[in-house]
Amino acid sequence: MSAGDISAINIKSVKKNRRRKKRRTADVSSSDSSSSDPSSESEKEEIQNGAIEEHVGENGKSDHVFSKGNDEDKQEDIAIEVSDVELTDEESKDLKLNSKEVIDDLTKISLSKIPEPTKSQNKEGFMNASKIAENIKLAREEYNELAENFVPKGKDKTKLREEYLNLLFENYGDDINRLRAAPDFTNKSLSILADALQEGIGMFDIGELELVLKNKEMEN
């Protein structure tokens, strides 16, 4: 072989080697893309369905946790809350009636649980209060009767009143005489004066009159 033939063979072998290298790199890139495509597509789908959260584990590797359907759940919760608030007039009336019926039923149950002795005790207490009021009324009537019929020892009411009038004339006799000597003093004026003195005596009970007269006697 000549030198030209050898150089031509070398050029061909170099070209073949270059083609083999290109095929290998193409195969490697295609295998990488094929192996990475499913994961990327699945990640895209999972990202569309929910949010990706990255957590670092104990071995230092990052794990991806997918929380699916958060937005959809929130939308459902919001829809439920709105539907709970938005009630029609008829539904609100029915709700009020039902609650009232429940309260009435609970009240009936509570009343039915009251023992019978409690009811009888209340009845006895009412009867006792009425009896006490009646006894107070009777005692008051008896007291008024005793006060009206009370007579001091050795003296009656008329005599006590006369003694009290004499006591008044002794102390205020000059004033009474001046009134009687006035030019406008008449028999009518005399009766008015007598009535006034009698009413003054009525301000005291028998015991008080007796005490006043007794003190006056002790002074003399």
Curated annotation (Swiss-Prot):
Pfam family, one: Rsa3
Biased composition (Low complexity): 29-39
Biased composition (Basic residues): 13-24
Modified sites of kind Phosphothreonine: 88
Main location: nucleus
Modification type Phosphoserine: residues: 83, 99
Protein's UniProt keywords contain Amino-acid biosynthesis: no
Cellular component terms per the entry's GO annotation: nucleolus; nucleus; preribosome, large subunit precursor
GO biological process: ribosomal large subunit assembly; ribosomal large subunit biogenesis
Compositionally biased region (Acidic residues): 73-91
Sequence segments annotated as region (Disordered): 1-91
Residue ranges with Basic and acidic residues bias: 41-72
Subcellular location: Nucleus, Nucleolus
Domain of life: Eukaryota
Alphabetized UniProt keyword annotations: Nucleus, Phosphoprotein, Ribonucleoprotein, Ribosome biogenesis
Function: Required for efficient biogenesis of the 60S ribosomal subunit.
Self-association and partners: Associates with nucleolar pre-ribosomal particles. Interacts with DBP6. Together with DBP6, NOP8, URB1 and URB2, forms an RNA-independent complex, which is required during early maturation of nascent 60S ribosomal subunits.
Family classification: Belongs to the RSA3 family.
Other comment: Present with 2940 molecules/cell in log phase SD medium.
UniProt-recorded name of the protein: Ribosome assembly protein 3
Organism: Saccharomyces cerevisiae (strain ATCC 204508 / S288c) (Baker's yeast)
Gene: RSA3
